[in-house]
Each structure stands twice: as structure tokens, then as C-alpha cells.
Amino acid sequence: LDEHLSGSFDYFIEKRHDILTTRNTAPNFIAITMPVVNIGKVDNKGFELVLKWNHSIGDFKYWINGNLSYAKNKIVYKDEIPHKYPWLYETGQSVGQPFGFIFDDFVTEADLESGKLPDHKLDLKPGDAKYKDLNGDNIIDDNDQCPIGNPIYPQLTAGITAGFEYKGFDFSMLWAGSGKVSRFISAGLRVPFGGGNYGLLQYMIDDHWTPETAETAKTPRFSGAANANNYTRNSTLWLKDASYIRLKNVQIGYTFKGEWMKKIHLKNMRIYASGENLLTFDHLKIADPEATDDKQFQYPLQMIFNIGLNLNF
């Protein structure tokens, strides 16, 4: 077993300080641009596990390598202005922690008739999004935003490489994935027609609210980009689990060897075929789970296929 299996395990605790960040605390009557200074503090901890297995059975040689890492950080200090409510502070949260409203279902006729809906600062209609009033003042505003979901930077990452060689044939593949990560659907993918002259995405057609789909709808009723309540407000409605597993690369080939190759002045010749981004398993579906919010409204990740010939003289 010892000659086939190897690996390593690392556990780390890191306390970073003097991080360059912008000052935020100043009297309200001072109209100046706050300086960037070395005052930030962030604690990090986590582990990395690497395992490797190599084995040969006659002419058949194979290997499997895997790695798994987990890293979590916490903002210890970032010079925040005093907040009225504890859920508004970024201090104590992870770097890249999303903040937003908590989606509390879609407005119904019964909600409107009851008169008990918090003031969302617009004329709500059935099918509009409604949010939780965290501070109980009966008004939905910035004081009702709180940490939601996981950070935008994955806390869990993993990868697997595997392959074999057998009498000139070779095969290899690479899988990668991440977990405990969230992504906001970008604004251009929330608003019908992208807020302009773009297409209507299939998920919008399938999931939007109508009186007939009120019990199963996953997105608000169709309305324009001006409806900030439904589309612009970041909330748990638009925050998605961006965990994924992706087959990043597969390659298969055959290497020719033999005395006959000397006659054509070749040491060896290899033909191969490869593919990239062939499979992805994820919850996001409508965008690349690896893409940050601002990159989602771009050309999607492509499958790539290659056929090649290597000649060694």
C-alpha cells in the first residue's frame, strides 16, 4: 500500500493585519474623500488534503490524484461606521459575504386586502416580490438588508485527475469543483429582455409569476426594468448556490513506436483527441457558476474539441 498511496494534509491559521482599506468613520459634516490606510484585519483558517494513488497491473498503469481544500475567513476590523442594527455590520462576516433582503414570497390579493404589508416604497401588485421587515418599522429599506447565503469566494474547492496507459494507449481526465459559494444572478439576466432589446430567457418564461402559476412561480410577474423592487434589489430571490462539478478536460491518445518508425526518421508518433468543458453539474443553470456577477452577461463558456498529431524526430 505504501508504494502506491501517498498524500499530505495541511492545516493553517493565518491572522492578517495592516490590510490596505478605506477609512469610513468621520464626522458627518466633513466633506472629504477618506484615505486608504493599512488598518484592516482578517483571520483565515482551513486545511488542504492531497491524496495520490499509482498502480500497475502488467502493462496496465493507472493513477488517481485528488485534492480537497477548505478555507474560511472572518473580517476582524475594517473601520465601519456605527450601524443601528447588528445585522448591518460586515465585521465578523467573511470577505465577499453577500448582503441583501430576505425574499418573503410573492404578493397576493390577500396581502393587499389585509393592509399589513410593510411599505415597499412602490405600488405593489400581485406577483411582485415582498421582503421581510427585519427591524419591524413597517418600511422596507436598507436597514432590512442582512448577510445572506455563502461568500462569493468558494470556501470549498476540489479536483481530481485520473488516467491510465496501456500498450501505447493513454487516457486522462481532470475534474474540478467548488462548494459553499453563492452568486447573485446579474441584473441583465434578471430583467425581462435584459431591460432593453435583449432576448427573453427560457427560465423567465418557465418560472415567472402569473395568476395561474402563483403556487409554483420562482420569479416575479413580468414588469419593466424600472421595477427596482422585483429586479434591482439584491435578495435571496436572486442569490443562488454556485456550487459545481465540472469535467474540465479529457484526452485520449495512442503512441506509435517500433523499428519501422526509424525508416521514416521518427522516434515516436502520437495521435490524440481532447475535449474541454464537456460536463457541468450545478444548481445555477442560467449562467456559468465560475463567472462572477459582472461576467455572467457575456459569451458563455464553450466546449472545445481538439484532434492532434505529435511527431518526435
Regions found by a protein language model. Name each.
Residues 21-25, 46, 132-140, 219-229:
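Active-site-adjacent bridging/hinge elements
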Residues 110, 115, 172-174, 181-183, ...:
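Short helix/loop capping segments that flank catalytic or ligand/cofactor-binding pockets
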Residues 1-100, 230, 234-313:
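Extracellular/periplasmic, surface-exposed regions of secreted and cell-surface proteins
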Residues 37, 54-152, 214:
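Conserved small-residue
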Residues 93, 167, 193:
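Phosphate-sensing "switch" segment of ASCE/P-loop ATPases
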Residues 16-17, 127, 150-152, 180-182, ...:
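A short local loop/turn or secondary-structure capping micro-motif enriched for an aromatic residue
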Residues 178-270:
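Extracytoplasmic gating/loop element in the C-terminal half of outer-membrane beta-barrel translocons
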Residues 151-185:
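Glycine-rich, aromatic-lined ligand/substrate-binding cores of catalytic
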